[in-house]
UniProtKB/Swiss-Prot annotation:
Protein name: Heme oxygenase
Intracellular or extracellular location(s): Microsome; Endoplasmic reticulum
Species for this entry: Takifugu rubripes (Japanese pufferfish)
Biological processes per GO annotation: heme catabolic process; heme oxidation; response to oxidative stress
Catalytic activity: heme b + 3 reduced [NADPH--hemoprotein reductase] + 3 O2 = biliverdin IXalpha + CO + Fe(2+) + 3 oxidized [NADPH--hemoprotein reductase] + 3 H2O + H(+)
Listed GO CC annotations: endoplasmic reticulum
Length: 277
């Protein structure tokens, strides 16, 4: 009898969407944590330039995600996991961007093309398949909630920040107990009714979410490698953003930044053979 109960419980656990996502994304999760940008965080070596560029991309990603979550908040697949008061990140990122870039921070945002692709996908599924938002909300929000406090302390120490200003993104004042809240969130997510086809698609979307994050991290690192210590990063853009290819990666940028980037690339071509196409 006890064995039957354990088998039944195990079967139910294996059917939980949260457990299935965790299982199918295990390998790609490790890859995401092994990117150069994330390793800098883990080693306590994150720089101000790294963090500022990361914040710019996080702003665009959460802008897309939270607009689509808000728009689909009554959808049967989204409503159970819609927790704007507890999880919304956009306002916290805006606060951090203003701290680092000043009141005109919106004119100084620079993001790689990988970020644009990520955002495009979120908006696309928000329009066509809102149930896929489950995958992006789960991987983003619970990932940030799980590592937020630790990464916040690492960032504060690495960048030698005196207080919590600039680190609002890592704080979840609406969540008194992260562990209890994550349990509630998973329970709500597991309660969403999906067909087998939809469930399979959500699992694939979760894999895609991690792949998008890896691409963003890699593109950001390429930008940092080329523009380290250059004043062009974060300069105002007076015209619509354009794209530039660096080492096979398309980077979303502005005319002034592109000029600085091009000069840096020319020097790099002479010294290490890096060619801008």
């Amino acid at each position: 009898m006890e064995a039957d109960k354990k088998t039944t419980a195990q079967t139910e656990s294996n059917r939980d969407l949260s457990e299935q996502i965790k299982k199918v994304t295990k390998d790609v999760h490790v890859r995401a944590e092994s990117t150069e940008l994330m390793l800098s965080f883990q080693r306590g070596q994150v720089t101000l330039q790294q963090y500022k560029l990361l914040l710019c991309s996080l702003y665009e990603i959460y802008l897309a995600l939270e607009e689509e979550m808000d728009r689909n908040c009554d959808h049967p697949s989204v409503a159970p996991i819609y927790f704007p008061a507890e999880l919304a990140r956009l306002a916290t990122i805006e606060k951090d961007l203003e701290f680092f870039f000043g009141p005109d921070w919106r004119e100084k945002i620079v993001v790689p093309a990988a970020t644009e692709r990520y955002c495009h996908r979120i908006r696309q599924i928000g329009q066509e398949n809102p149930e896929y938002l489950i995958a992006h909300a789960y991987t983003r929000y619970l990932g940030d909630l799980s590592g937020g406090q630790v990464l916040g302390r690492i960032a504060q120490k690495s960048m030698k920040l005196g207080g919590s200003e600039g680190l609002s993104f890592f704080a979840f004042p609406g969540v008194s107990s992260p562990n209890l809240f994550k349990r509630l969130y998973r329970s709500r997510m597991n309660s969403v009714e999906l067909t087998e086809e939809q469930r399979s698609a959500v699992l694939q979307e979760a894999l895609g979410a991690f792949e998008f994050n890896i691409q963003v991290f890699e593109d950001l690192q390429k930008m940092l490698n080329v523009t380290e210590n250059e004043p062009g990063v974060g300069t105002p853009r007076s015209r619509p953003a354009t794209t530039l290819q660096v080492g096979g990666s398309m980077i979303q940028t502005n005319p002034l930044f592109r000029m600085v980037l091009g000069l840096c690339l020319a020097l790099a071509t002479v010294s290490i053979g890096l060619y801008a196409l």
